Amino acid sequence: MPEPAKSAPAPKKGSKKAVTKTQKKGDKKRRKSRKESYSIYVYKVLKQVHPDTGISSKAMGIMNSFVNDIFERIAGEASRLAHYNKRSTITSREIQTAVRLLLPGELAKHAVSEGTKAVTKYTSSK
């Protein structure tokens, strides 16, 4: 039985490095694609809570994954709530209800109060 021809190894799944093209004559240099994350915001909150504490890149990756997961859960639940009520817009009310449904007890209360505070601050600054 003939062996199949081996091709170049495929890049690992979840690889974060941007693929750069070799520069051709007359072409402009290609920029690396930006990878969005919540790391700067996680770092700012960490410094507010514990100014003398650092965070490893692995821990930051976990925190980024956590924030993305919670965001998707809240957005999904808010979307479902809007659909149930035959609405085409997700308002702060849907977000608040989604948070109450997803987060347990005291955590939900704190999240709702912080969210209300943030919305009030935003509307007053407009």
Curated annotation (Swiss-Prot):
Record keywords, A-Z: Acetylation, Chromosome, DNA-binding, Glycoprotein, Isopeptide bond, Nucleosome core, Nucleus, Phosphoprotein, Ubl conjugation
Q: How is it modified after translation?
A: Monoubiquitination of Lys-121 by the BRE1 gives a specific tag for epigenetic transcriptional activation and is also prerequisite for histone H3 'Lys-4' and 'Lys-79' methylation.
Q: What InterPro entries does this protein map onto?
A: Histone-fold, Histone_H2A/H2B/H3, Histone_H2B, HISTONE_H2B_site
Gene3D superfamilies (UniProt xref): Histone, subunit A
The protein's matches in PROSITE patterns, at most eight in alphabetical order, are given as: HISTONE_H2B
Residues modified to Phosphoserine? 15
DNA-binding listed as a keyword? yes
Q: Fetch the Pfam families from UniProt.
A: Histone
Compositional bias per record (Low complexity), positions renumbered to this chain: 1-12
For the keyword Glycoprotein, the answer is yes
Q: Which GO terms describe its molecular function?
A: DNA binding; protein heterodimerization activity; structural constituent of chromatin
Disulfide feature: none
Q: Where in the cell is it found?
A: Nucleus; Chromosome
Question: Glycosylated residues?
Answer: 113
Q: Where is the composition biased (Basic residues)?
A: 13-34
Family of this protein: Belongs to the histone H2B family.
Q: How does it assemble?
A: The nucleosome is a histone octamer containing two molecules each of H2A, H2B, H3 and H4 assembled in one H3-H4 heterotetramer and two H2A-H2B heterodimers. The octamer wraps approximately 147 bp of DNA.
Q: What is this protein called?
A: Histone H2B 5
Its ancestry begins with: Eukaryota, Metazoa, Chordata, Craniata, Vertebrata
